[in-house]
Amino acid sequence: MLEQLPYLALKTPPKTTALLKAECADFIVKEHLGYEMSGDGEFVALYVRKTDCNTLFVGEKLAKFAGVSERNMGYAGLKDRRAVTEQWFCLQMPGMETPDFSQFELDGVEILTVTRHNRKIRTGSLEGNYFDILLRGAEESDELKARLDFVANFGFPNYFTEQRFGRDGHNLTQALRWAQGEIKVKDRKKRSFYLSAARSEIFNLVVAARIEKSTINQVLPNDIVQLAGSHSWFKADEKEDLTALQVRLENQDILLTAPLIGEDILAASEIENEIVNQHSAFDPLMKQERMKAARRPLLMKAKGFSWAFEPEGLRLKFYLPAGSYATALVRELVNYTEE
């Protein structure tokens, strides 16, 4: 799926090959919630380091150890399994003593902090993640350095990557079958996965079309643009001066966006409208599930982006806001294979 999408850096696929996640320690993720724990309240908050562990599995084990239902366990986001990741979990335990988590044992899990918090850590309630990635076997070259400079200065396509679509695109296939009435989906989690895959596919196709038409950095009539640093957006319609908006785009005051489709269809640029209309089979599903339309930036620029060539390969360090994928950045640099 992702291999069919165009590249932005140098307009060509990378020549350098590398191994991604050859070892768990090659892919380090540290969650940034954007707020501090209150220190008191009915929730026990745990900052956990996991190595080669599934987020849900660890959360379930923590809940079982504390003697509470899995429904009373919360986390901000799922993290890669084959990695070393640090993230917060919470357990709702009103009027109960904080368990002695020094007695908690699970292979690959280390509890770094135990405190209290006054509200549940909910899915999506994080600002972003810090990444430390080693691309094994990536050798220094002029081509790779040019790609690094490009990504540092101009960013990368904000594609959804393989995690969003399931193994071999299974979630997208099931979403289409569901939309066409071939299957019924009763499981709430599966419904969410399938809807996300459908919305992500359409988003990716719009980004790809903008790259192919060389309009990824050009404000088009009826584009939906987002104010940088916020979730507010407006349409570049006849009331707006496109030349002035282009200057604001180049000054990074605004961002171009593509759709995460929902029940309310919003007309936008011709490129976007054409792709959305081609996938109208999903429209009844979006209305049935009461999905709210949203916008997502076409491009993403990593904060604190740095790199160093080491004996084992290329090390990258950067920060991305929640919802953006490190592998979307990596694919602009190297032709990687995941272990």
UniProtKB/Swiss-Prot annotation:
Q: Which residues form the active site?
A: D80 (nucleophile)
Disulfide-bonded cysteine pairs: these are none
Show the Gene3D superfamilies listed in the entry.
TruD, catalytic domain, TruD, insertion domain
Keywords from the named record:
Isomerase, tRNA processing
Q: Which Pfam families match?
A: TruD (PF01142)
Q: What is its EC number?
A: 5.4.99.27
GO molecular function (one): tRNA pseudouridine(13) synthase activity
Q: Which GO terms describe its biological process?
A: pseudouridine synthesis; tRNA pseudouridine synthesis
Annotated TRUD domain residues: 155-311
Recorded hits in InterPro entries, A to Z, give: PsdUridine_synth_cat_dom_sf, PsdUridine_synth_TruD, PsdUridine_synth_TruD_CS, PsdUridine_synth_TruD_insert, TruD_catalytic, TruD_insert_sf, TruD_pseudoU_synthase
Per its record, the protein catalyses: uridine(13) in tRNA = pseudouridine(13) in tRNA
Membrane-spanning intervals of the chain: none
**May I have one GO cellular component term?**
cytosol
Q: Taxonomically, which superkingdom? A: Bacteria
> Which family, according to the similarity comment?
Belongs to the pseudouridine synthase TruD family.
Q: What does this protein do?
A: Responsible for synthesis of pseudouridine from uracil-13 in transfer RNAs.
**Protein's recorded name:** tRNA pseudouridine synthase D
Supply the source organism for this entry. Haemophilus influenzae (strain ATCC 51907 / DSM 11121 / KW20 / Rd)
